[in-house]
Curated annotation (Swiss-Prot):
Positions annotated to bind Ni(2+): H2, E3, D40
Function in brief: Involved in the maturation of [NiFe] hydrogenases. Required for nickel insertion into the metal center of the hydrogenase. Is also required for urease maturation.
Origin superkingdom: Bacteria
Transmembrane spans: none
Record keywords: Metal-binding, Nickel, Zinc
Residues that, per the record, bind Zn(2+): C74, C77, C91, C94
Impact noted for substituting H79A: Does not affect nickel-binding ability
Gene Ontology molecular function: any one: nickel cation binding
Subunit record text: Monomer and homodimer. Forms a complex with HypB.
Naturally occurring in which organism (per UniProt): Helicobacter pylori (strain ATCC 700392 / 26695) (Campylobacter pylori)
Record-stated family: Belongs to the HypA/HybF family.
Protein's UniProt name: Hydrogenase/urease maturation factor HypA
Amino acid sequence: MHEYSVVSSLIALCEEHAKKNQAHKIERVVVGIGERSAMDKSLFVSAFETFREESLVCKDAILDIVDEKVELECKDCSHVFKPNALDYGVCEKCHSKNVIITQGNEMRLLSLEMLAE
C-alpha cells in the first residue's frame, strides 16, 4: 500500500506549486501512471480522495489519471520503441537483449490547474 505515501508526497508537491504560483486553490491534478509502476489505480484514487480532504488547497481537486505505456531503449542500437507484448527482453530492430525501460515504470505529476489569488 505504498500508494498512500506516494499520494501524501503528491499532495505536498501540489501545495508547494500552489504556494510558488500564489494560487489559493488547485482544481485539477493530472498524473501519469506507468503500466509497470506497481501502482494500484483504485488505491491511488482512494488515497487521493482521503488526503485531499486534509489540504485546503487541494480539497476540491479533481484527479485525472493518464495511463502511460512502457517505452524501451536498446542500449546496442539506440532504437526506442513501445513493445507490443509483455516481452520486454528483446529489441524489435536488432534483436539485442540489452534493453532498458525508459518510460512506463513511474508515476509522474503531469499538470496542475490552479486558481491564483
